């Protein structure tokens, strides 16, 4: 299977998001990379489903809460920017203060 670097990045994020979901199910708090991967995956999949950019920007800030991440992680993440593929092309989605 020949994958482009972008496709490899997408797969890595998706796998990290799967790990993050499993940890949340077990009650384990997420670290920085897991939290970012989970929110990023939410945005990427929402874009593929055709959800509008503005909706993803707002909903992306409600994927996980401070109680679900390790101490200090929420303060480390001010913005998450994701290049996501929408039905009408690729767009940059920014989620401000994604962990509240």
Swiss-Prot record:
Domain of life: Bacteria
Ion transport recorded as keyword: no
EC number: 3.5.1.5
The UniProt record lists the keyword Cytoplasm: yes
Biological processes per GO annotation: urea catabolic process
Sequence similarity: Belongs to the urease gamma subunit family.
PANTHER family: UREASE (PTHR33569:SF1)
UniProt-recorded name of the protein: Urease subunit gamma
GN (gene name): ureA
């Amino acid at each position: 299977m020949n994958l482009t670097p972008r496709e490899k990045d997408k797969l890595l994020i998706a796998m990290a998001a799967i790990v993050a979901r499993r940890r949340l199910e077990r009650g384990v708090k997420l670290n920085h990379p897991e939290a970012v991967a989970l929110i990023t995956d939410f945005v990427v999949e929402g874009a593929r489903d055709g959800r509008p950019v503005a909706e993803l920007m707002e909903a992306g800030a409600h994927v996980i809460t401070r109680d679900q991440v390790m101490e200090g992680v929420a303060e480390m993440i001010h913005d998450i920017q994701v290049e996501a593929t929408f039905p009408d092309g690729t767009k940059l989605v920014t989620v401000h203060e994604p962990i509240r």
